[in-house]
Design a protein with these regions (language model features):
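Bacterial N-terminal signal peptides that target proteins for export
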Residues: 2-11
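Bacterial N-terminal signal peptides
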Residues: 11-20
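Transmembrane beta-barrel domains of Gram-negative outer membranes and organellar outer membranes
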Residues: 26-141, 152-156, 166, 204-206, ...
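Flexible, glycine-rich linker and terminal segments associated
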Residues: 27-32, 37-39, 188, 192, ...
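Feature captures outer-membrane beta-barrel proteins of Gram-negative bacteria and organelles
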Residues: 47, 72-83, 106-121, 130, ...
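Short, aliphatic-rich beta-strand segments
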Residues: 54-58, 300-308
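Outer-membrane beta-barrel translocator domains and adjoining extracellular loop/strand segments
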Residues: 67-69, 98-103, 141-143, 171-176, ...
Length: 699
């Protein structure tokens, strides 16, 4: 059997050499391995996933204990930033059995990282990387640390790799020197051979070239050609799908430039500025769904104030669409109507009638910026002292489309889950939330959320292990919010009073100060809630809940990165701290959190969590009105595991926070993406948002 496999593998390896008499050098694709890194079969190369790429890989045939085992691997991978890839992996032999009885002895959840060292040596063909597999946790089934280098040749599509690893895998894979070769004779075919520190392996990989599938999606499959390990019972193979989370929309100056129809529509829109009136501008803004529209002038500058409730992925989109419409309607005639004498315009973006950002620019300069004929260095963003400035404006129109008593009905899936536990690979309680958010007076709103259970696994059913965590059919939240901003110190505050978590009545206050640039933010959250009943459903005395949390956030929009430190008393009464690093892929936020907290008279407990927050609503929602129905702009999916302990017992509630869908950061400050630096970094997105809007207007 082994000899037959060797002959077949050798023939397969030699065949591509005869496909052509000359080799054309091309970039060798970076593909997944059967372990938690990009690479060959069991060994890595020094490449990494591209920034913003999400990949899912299903694999069978893993090195565990003293053999290659018939195990399933479910791997989720991210290109966090240039050079760094992160992996979360579930390894299991069984999906539903209780491991306290029998599930094949393994059900493992782990995290892994690989970092490609920045190329400071000046040789593009040579790369180095460092990595760690199965980081932290209490049971490190596949723990491996490694360093690897690879070299790509110019004369042929070949990449050689060599490295050294320290591994706790009993089979010995990557515990010592390892190396391999990747050969890509065709744009869709790759063949690899490796020495994994114990045996030789070879695989063939088929993949879709870039641009073959829509939205730049790529797919790949890998199958074992040969292995020196005993694989009679289980061959090694994997299948993967990769999706880029970052498009050219937010930062590309060439976005839609090659669309002749769009450019013609843009030219037509910009010609309106010469003859347009103030009433035409107001009508255009109202027709696009903007509310609280008002026009005036201040210091010979035309002023437009409005509120965006339609573009909910990012307030920059609403700002960009509004600026595009204004620049196409605010010509000399319109400026003269409001008493202005220059072609400067300042747009104030409101949130529930409260100003949150202004942008000031020369309108002709901005028109050239939109059509791509020139850059515009005249765009100025301001986030401080906006209310005081608005009070000085000489308004020439009444407020149009106030939006008072209008409501948003926001639908969102909800899930409580347990991942890769002894009770199953994935246990869940699935529900649908419907959140009615009604605008009242300036800064005030009523917020009511209902939870409707839809489905649950057996362990969330009655008498199941997670029974107490299953969703119930209830009004889960009913609150009155009031936002205000303190003058002079420019501290924003929102007070919320009412019902949370179905059974608790009380109040919550959140305060935040932003630096003008937005690089620094300091927040304080205080809350106190009482249970509506003296005893819970199990007959135990209920406890009051309170939080007292201080937060510091550092933002680097040029890196699409934020760091947050939170410390204090959490919802369940435990005291400690959280450290979170967040990376933004356009409007998708991927975060990793380390937390350490303790209850009174207990030891500290450490956890690591990974979360993904993504918009589940269209880029351009339905137009606001008496009732606007939309999806959740920041749906949160997260997984947590214990670290720093010899055991990994299930734990619930430590580090728990009072999460509010309608928190101040989400409703007023663009999910924390705020400050002049952030808006300055996203000027191209302003332009592209308007162009994207125009594509919706083309018949």
């Amino acid at each position: 059997m082994a000899q037959k496999t060797i002959k077949t593998g050798t023939a397969a390896l030699l065949l591509p050499l005869f496909l052509s008499t000359s080799l054309t050098a091309q970039e060798v694709a970076t593909l997944p391995s059967n372990q938690s890194f990009t690479g060959l079969t069991f060994t890595p190369n020094a490449q990494s996933l591209n920034y913003g790429v999400f990949s899912f890989t299903y694999a069978q045939g893993l090195p565990w204990r003293a053999a290659v085992q018939d195990l399933d691997s479910l791997k989720f991978s991210f290109g966090m930033f240039d050079g760094l890839e992160a992996h979360g992996r579930i390894v299991t032999d069984d999906y539903t059995s209780n491991c306290f009885y029998d599930c094949g002895d393994i059900r493992d959840l782990s995290m892994s990282f690989k970092y490609q060292v920045p190329n400071f040596w000046g040789t593009d063909n040579l790369d180095f990387a460092l990595g760690i597999q199965d980081l932290g946790g209490s049971a490190n089934q596949f723990s491996t640390k490694y360093a690897v280098a690879d070299y790509s040749f110019d004369f042929a599509p070949i990449r050689l790799s060599a490295g050294y690893g320290l591994s706790e895998i009993e089979l010995g894979v990557m515990d010592g020197p390892f190396g391999g070769i990747e050969y890509q004779p065709l744009s869709f075919l790759q063949i690899s051979g490796e020495y994994d520190a114990v045996e030789f392996n070879s695989s063939v990989k088929l993949f879709t070239p870039q641009g073959t599938l829509p939205y730049d999606v790529t797919a790949s499959v890998s199958y074992q050609l040969y292995s020196g390990h005993n694989t009679d019972e289980q061959n090694m193979w994997n299948a993967a799908l990769s999706v880029p989370l970052v498009t050219g929309y937010t930062r590309s100056r060439d976005y839609s430039r090659h669309s002749v129809t769009l450019m013609e529509r843009l030219s037509l829109e910009q010609k309106k500025a010469k003859e347009a009136s103030i009433s035409a501008l107001v009508s255009a803004l109202r027709n696009e769904g903007f509310v609280n529209i008002q026009i005036g002038f201040l210091n010979q500058t035309a002023v437009v104030a409005l509120e965006n409730r339609r573009y909910n992925h990012n307030q920059v989109d609403g700002l960009g669409v509004a600026m595009g419409i204004v620049s196409s309607h605010l010509g000399q005639n319109a400026v003269a109507e409001v008493g202005g004498e220059s072609d400067r315009v300042e747009l104030f973006m409101l949130a529930n009638q409260k100003p949150v950002v202004s942008v000031q620019v020369n309108s002709s300069c901005y028109q050239n910026f939109i059509n791509g004929s020139a850059t515009c260095d005249d765009i100025k963003f301001t986030t401080r002292d906006l209310s005081e400035k608005l009070e000085l404006v000489d308004w020439k129109t009444e407020r149009v489309n106030s939006g008072v008593l209008d409501s948003q009905l926001i639908f969102s899936p909800m899930v409580r889950h347990a991942v890769a536990t002894e009770f199953g690979v994935y246990d869940y309680s699935f529900a649908m939330s419907s959140n009615l958010y009604t605008y009242l007076w300036s800064g005030a709103a009523v917020d009511v959320r209902h939870i409707l259970p839809l489905a649950e696994s057996d362990d969330y059913e009655k008498w199941g292990y997670f029974d107490d965590s299953a969703y119930e059919n209830d009004i889960e939240r009913a609150m009155l919010h009031q936002f205000f901003r303190l003058p002079y110190v420019d501290i924003a505050n929102q007070v919320s009073i009412g019902l949370v978590k179905t059974d608790y009545i009380g109040a919550r206050s959140e305060s935040t100060w932003f630096s003008q640039s937005g690089a620094h933010a300091i927040s304080l959250e205080m809350s106190y809630f009482q249970h509506v009943d003296e005893k819970d459903k199990n007959g135990y005395e209920t406890l009051d809940r309170q939080t007292s949390l201080a937060r510091y956030t550092f933002s680097m929009p040029e890196w699409d990165w934020q760091f947050n430190a939170t410390a204090g008393e959490f919802w369940r009464g435990d005291v400690g701290a959280k450290l979170t690093t967040s990376h933004w892929f356009e409007d998708i936020e991927v975060s990793a959190t380390y937390q350490v907290t303790k209850f009174k008279d207990t030891d500290e407990e450490q956890f690591v969590a990974v979360s993904v927050k993504l918009p589940l609503t269209p880029w351009r929602d339905m137009s606001p009105g008496l009732l606007q129905v939309r999806g959740n702009e920041a749906y949160d999916f997260n997984v947590m595991t214990r670290v720093g302990n010899d055991v990994n017992y299930l734990s619930d509630g430590q580090g728990d926070e009072l999460i509010m869908d309608n928190s101040m950061l989400r409703r007023y400050f663009n999910r924390g993406r705020y400050g002049s630096d952030y808006f300055e970094e996203n000027k191209i997105r302003l332009r592209n948002a308007y162009l994207r809007y125009l594509t919706t207007q083309i018949d």
